[in-house]
Amino acid sequence: MTQGKRKHPCDLKNPSKRAPPATCNKPNGAILCGDFCLHEGYNIGKCVMRRTGKACICSQCEGW
């Protein structure tokens, strides 16, 4: 029996939302990402590496 990749508990209740493209590529990208997520009603936002570059991901959970 194979198990799929487990989702983070925060992802189950609170689907992540992406900020506008290239937000995290700017010098102050982390700040812009956090501000965008707060404005959208999330608790936290951070830049993560993806295959296509950095992406801003919003979450309701701290420390994810």
From Swiss-Prot:
List keywords of the entry alphabetically: Antimicrobial, Disulfide bond, Fungicide, Plant defense
Q: Which cysteines are joined by disulfide bonds?
A: C10-C61, C24-C47, C33-C56, C37-C58
Q: Where is this region: Disordered?
A: 1-21
Q: Name one GO biological process term.
A: defense response to fungus
Whether Disulfide bond counts among this entry's keywords is: yes
Spell out the coiled coil positions from the record. none
Q: Which domain of life is it from?
A: Eukaryota
Tell me which family the UniProt entry assigns to this protein. Belongs to the DEFL family.
Name of the protein in its database record: Defensin-like protein 41
Biological source species: Arabidopsis thaliana
* Highest classification ranks of the organism: Eukaryota, Viridiplantae, Streptophyta, Embryophyta, Tracheophyta
